[in-house]
């Protein structure tokens, strides 16, 4: 890790990230040193939603889960037809509804983002996005981004007693990530 991280601020990268749940969006929004484009919630397609793997594996749960989004979309349409204003209709979204975002972020903030968001302790959805972003960064410039990944890969784990205990496995995984 360089002591001259300010040089990383000169490099910026823009990502279009599709199918980000509203729940995951809060994790992206916590990174203040970025320019993030979020579409109006009034334009969100209420039929689009994330499907967690654990729910997808259980047919009954999957059916009930998808039905909740369908019913919410129906309620939205009923409220809209009843004249409820668009701004209030944003409240008829579920945290699993998805939208597409665009973010521009510099190399220094990306280092912090990857340390936090590619960690096994990160929320699963943002971790998947972070790993996909890291693959693209390594394609663009592997000489710099081969050093990016979770804290345990970059230096040492910062999770203290909450550590996953898999630092060696993570060093191998992120060391071989392409």
Model regions: which residues?
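A conserved ligand/cofactor-binding region detector
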Residues: 1-178
């Amino acid at each position: 890790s360089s002591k001259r991280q300010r040089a990383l601020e000169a490099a910026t990268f823009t990502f279009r990230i599709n199918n980000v749940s509203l729940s995951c969006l809060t994790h992206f929004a916590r990174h203040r040193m970025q320019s993030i484009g979020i579409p109006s919630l009034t334009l969100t397609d209420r039929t689009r939603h994330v499907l967690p793997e654990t729910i997808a594996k259980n047919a009954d749960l999957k059916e009930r889960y998808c039905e909740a989004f369908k019913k919410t979309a129906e309620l939205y349409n009923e409220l809209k037809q009843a004249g409820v204003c668009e701004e209030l209709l944003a409240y008829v979204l579920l945290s699993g509804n998805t939208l597409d975002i665009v973010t521009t972020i510099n190399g220094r903030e990306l280092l912090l983002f990857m340390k936090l968001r590619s960690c096994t302790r990160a929320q699963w959805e943002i971790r998947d996005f972070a790993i996909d972003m890291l693959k693209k960064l390594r394609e663009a410039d592997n000489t710099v981004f081969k050093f990016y990944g979770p804290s345990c890969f970059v230096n040492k784990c910062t999770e203290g007693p909450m550590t996953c205990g898999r630092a060696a496995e993570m060093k191998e995984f992120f060391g071989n990530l392409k």
